[in-house]
Curated annotation (Swiss-Prot):
Pfam families, A to Z: Ribosomal_S19
Gene3D superfamilies: 30s Ribosomal Protein S19, Chain A
Biological source species: Hyperthermus butylicus (strain DSM 5456 / JCM 9403 / PLM1-5)
Function: Protein S19 forms a complex with S13 that binds strongly to the 16S ribosomal RNA.
Gene Ontology BP terms: ribosomal small subunit assembly; translation
Single GO cellular component term: cytosolic small ribosomal subunit
Alphabetical keyword list: Ribonucleoprotein, Ribosomal protein, RNA-binding, rRNA-binding
Molecular function per GO: rRNA binding; structural constituent of ribosome
Domain of life: Archaea
Presence of the UniProt keyword Secreted in the record: no
Protein name (database record): Small ribosomal subunit protein uS19
Amino acid sequence: MKKWLETLPPEWKKFRYRGYTLEELLAMPMDQFIKLLPARQRRSLLRGLTDAQRRLLWKIRKARQKMLQGKKVVVKTHVRDMIILPEMVGLTIAVYNGKEFIPVKITPEMIGHYLGEFSPTCKQVQHGEPGLKATRSTLHVALK
């Protein structure tokens, strides 16, 4: 665990979540960490992890071992309802948005949020120039 913490940027080590440093959060038992989370996330984790969430955690632990060997690993997942835990910090997780996998670099500030929050499912609408018969305003445009 110590080796992995040394690979993180120094400003991440100063980060505090509800008064605890990242190192303290990693050493903390899961049931004690769950008590620090907001109600919605706390209830979700107390009900237990789904099979898909357990598989994702297993993939994340394997990816972290590969990171220690110097390999860059991106974990792909469809599990948007997984809560970001301290052990995920520093990894890149590609979250599926319904069309493609959006890479999300996990930072300490993301702890306690859902993965799906960082992979929007809808694009923002960008309206183009109105053409003929596009809107009512084109009724008064002279045809060529």
